[in-house]
Amino acid sequence: AVEITQNMNMGGITRIEEYFPVKDEQAAFDPMLQRLYHGLDQKIFETTRKPEPIRIVENIEEENEKEGLALSPEEIDYLHKVESQLGRKLTDSEVFGFAQINSEHCRHKIFGGIFIIDGKEMPSSLFAMIKKTTKEHPHKIISAYKDNVAFAQGPVVEQFAPEDQSTSDYFVIKDIESVISLKAETHNFPTTVEPFNGAATGTGGEIRDRMGGGTGSWPIAGTAVYMTAYPRLGGGRKWENVLPVRKWLYQTPEQILIKASNGASDFGNKFGQPLIAGSVLTFEHQENGEKYGYDKVIMLAGGVGYGTKRDCLKKEPQPGNKIVVIGGDNYRIGLGGGSVSSVDTGRYSNGIELNAIQRANPEMQKRAYNLIRALCEENVNPIVSIHDHGSAGHVNCLSELVEDCGGVIDMEKLPIGDKTLSAKEIIANESQERMGLLIDRQHLGHVQKIAERERAPMYVVGETTGDAHFSFVQKDGEKPFDLDVAQMFGHSPKTVMVDETVERSYEDVTYETSNISEYLTNVLQLEAVACKDWLTNKVDRSVTGKVAR
């Protein structure tokens, strides 16, 4: 809003706030983005809160429960070994950051773990089984299971883009050898807790993953899938009485289906990626004393895009590459999303779980995308590597960028929207719509010119070092995060899942042929069978002009 006034040559405006009256103190509002005031005066812009200092963690076990870190006993033992290696206790930023970086959400520990079933260790992990298909039948797959997206060989296509993206220039047409990108990921926990923003940031994060494939690529269209317990629309249908209505922890299935589809569609519409397909499944069942249902919902965001074959693989970082962040400021938003989303919803307090939910900003993401698109369209792409800021914010994204070489981050260069943030909150907040890039030093000025044209906030926050060490350094020289890359990623213990085979049998379906018409009517009413337009056709599905029906 402030930038709009600046573009209109309205000087002297540094901050714009929106206020609206409410009846009483019980009025609903988003505590991350809004605050309830008893009156408006100049003092509302003042705060006496100071950033919390760097804290040494004396007891990792207590910290684990207090902060909702979802660390396993084996991981806690591992951190004690790291303390011994360092000869010191870990900081709150290091413990918190490690928990996010190595959460199930970020590292797929269950999929990559060891399974022992009926006393026998399985010959491969779930991830290895999935990868086996591609290994044995690669066909046209170029890259899979090692980047933000998968790429398959595409056709030769025409690219219509400016010759020089840093200035007003003629558009030229040239042939490029393309790759097709595919991506899907769940955003279950955030959508369960706060459906609109949960689904919106799920869609936004999936788009950023396609932006961050190789050294940059372009999203085209999105999809969304929702799975919930029965919504009981209009008072409920008779088969929905199989289980009593639960006291839902956050939102009802009906609210989730409506708000989540609103959120996913809204983000795509504002960003400029149409949501063109989707699905929904509602299910509950009770038999043999066991109850089944999608009480913790599934929200699957997916999409397709394309890029150039030239850019489909990341390059090797070299010492001296500049670490660049594109996008918005840091706020107290989305703290601990990786770890909290990796356990059962409801395990931690409402405060911890609500703090872990991100908030969407599609306009900022569009600005970041415009810059990345421009760099990928040029004859020389200056991007060495690229990752999106999702779970765990800077500490996860930037550490992935420098995983092969190490790096140092100057915290003074990180954009701060809330001056009360502690070092831990700056390092690990999940303020959305940011991308991390490694840029060759020689191209930095050119990239900055394009960023200014696209109004994409760009910050040079550090550089790669080549010493396999990663640290965040404050202005005073203190290091709230200071670990070897190997200590962050390399040797955390494998997850071991022990289970046994359980034989189950269910009653056969019984029916009367005379009731076929009724059965058919009921089946056609199921959300999984009925028309999905109410979920997928909410907004413009031809935005960008690249999708036709």
Model segments located where?
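Contiguous, structured surface segment used for ligand recognition
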Residues: V2
